[in-house]
Amino acid sequence: MRAWLLLLAVLATFQTIVRVASTEDISQRFIAAIAPVAAHIPLASASGSGSGRSGSRSVGASTSTALAKAFNPFSEPASFSDSDKSHRSKTNKKPSKSDANRQFNEVHKPRTDQLENSKNKSKQLVNKPNHNKMAVKEQRSHHKKSHHHRSHQPKQASASTESHQSSSIESIFVEEPTLVLDREVASINVPANAKAIIAEQGPSTYSKEALIKDKLKPDPSTLVEIEKSLLSLFNMKRPPKIDRSKIIIPEPMKKLYAEIMGHELDSVNIPKPGLLTKSANTVRSFTHKDSKIDDRFPHHHRFRLHFDVKSIPADEKLKAAELQLTRDALSQQVVASRSSANRTRYQVLVYDITRVGVRGQREPSYLLLDTKTVRLNSTDTVSLDVQPAVDRWLASPQRNYGLLVEVRTVRSLKPAPHHHVRLRRSADEAHERWQHKQPLLFTYTDDGRHKARSIRDVSGGEGGGKGGRNKRQPRRPTRRKNHDDTCRRHSLYVDFSDVGWDDWIVAPLGYDAYYCHGKCPFPLADHFNSTNHAVVQTLVNNMNPGKVPKACCVPTQLDSVAMLYLNDQSTVVLKNYQEMTVVGCGCR
């Protein structure tokens, strides 16, 4: 009886390790471990009291040793069989996953059969304790010698059987670590916030993208609602249907996007030196539309450029417009031949074509918009202000005749003899190379959706004006308690690929919007960024909870997010959207 109680105690000790194997494997290991001991328990109890106690102790100790080894699948076996030794002697390197599976099938199958034989043998020994030698021979004809030896020497047989079973069980259940890892990975249940958890953790054994794509795909109804909300936010009726592979994103747009994202802006305004873009929040780039009229300008120093700006919404206000031309530095030999400073400088002039000419009847009318001086030995872009022309085009789209650009010498105003300022594509120039150097028109508009004040002023716009606690300077230092349930900012990543928008949104592929959540406990500390009204509300709630609710955890500071995308007309658009991401949270 004590031996069985000891067995139960050992099983409880190794309950954690048993989780690695299945229930069927546990039953087989348990029967194989206790079979030889259970067969000889009556023999130990039938002897004297002293011998019975010592026998019980020895049986319990041997049983504990056998079970401890049998139920520890991660321990190295004390002894190996001949097949194990021959297999380990053939190779010194760590077996691969396929080798481990093959070794498992070769070694474990016959030993599993051996366990079944031990199971049947133990049942018969327990049911027939007073067996004779002839009955044993008839029932165990294929094991006559081994069983005959055990029946004459029970103690020696018990010890040898225990050692043999312990070695066999150890060899069978020492699994390859990769097999255990694969089984654990397959049983992973990814939580809803797995993306935020993975982002906060370090490098993982598994692929972050694979886990997220396989386990966190929203259902179709959720995707439809997300798409509707984002379209309303972006002021669109439907997502654009375009071929991204045929569109080249201009380098100036990429640089402007990097400039906006790399600086802390106080509002949604897009800064542009030299232009009145203080209240602009949208930038669009346009390329020249080829037509038959281009054949009338065969020279490189004089060319007509036409830009279709119909994609600009009528409710947006134009704040600025500029024409950017690319300059290619000439060789040192050409620059050296022009020893005079006047010969190494050229003038670029841009005109608005206000009226087209009629051959033999009238000449076209031009309006000079801007002029710039450039040098031959510099490679850069030249920007020209063309806002009056674009304003006229938006008011009367049918009178958009384009721009006329000329390159002349500074002194004599004669045509420039070199291809310094790139106005048109050369005959032998590749199309891909020209796309990075072609003239571009940039328009800066305001859609009127952003507020007049800075979006960072949200923190001071509620509950108390000048008396707001967040305005108090200087603050006394406070010791923050790291409580997860108090008001704070949490991660919330928005991935545009979830709604299939990664084909027309160039950058970013997603952004962290964050959200505010948590309790506002009494009393409110300074780091909760609360107003005087929130302090009074929390005080009244503490005295009479049923009268007023607690203060709420809400965003106190918001920031804008710049997006670079393509519209239905394949126009590259850079837009700053206000109040897109949470900067700070507080109790209000």
UniProtKB/Swiss-Prot annotation:
Sorted alphabetically, the keyword list is: Developmental protein, Differentiation, Disulfide bond, Glycoprotein, Growth factor, Secreted, Signal
Q: Where are the compositionally biased (Low complexity) regions?
A: 156-169
- Repeat as UniProt keyword: no
Record site: Cleavage: R456
The answer, when asked if tRNA processing is one of the entry's keywords, is no
Subcellular compartments: Secreted
Instruction: Identify the SMART domains for this entry.
Output: TGFB (SM00204)
Q: What cellular component terms from Gene Ontology apply here? A: cell leading edge; dense core granule lumen; extracellular space
Q: Where are the transmembrane segments?
A: none
Q: Residue ranges under compositional bias (Basic and acidic residues)?
A: 96-119
Q: Describe the subunit structure.
A: Heterodimers of scw/dpp are the active subunit, dpp/dpp homodimers elicit a basal response and scw/scw homodimers alone are ineffective in specifying a dorsal pattern. Component of a complex composed of dpp, sog and tsg. Interacts with nord and gbb; the interaction interferes with dpp secretion.
Its family?
Answer: Belongs to the TGF-beta family.
Q: What is this protein called?
A: Protein decapentaplegic
Q: Which organism is it from?
A: Drosophila melanogaster (Fruit fly)
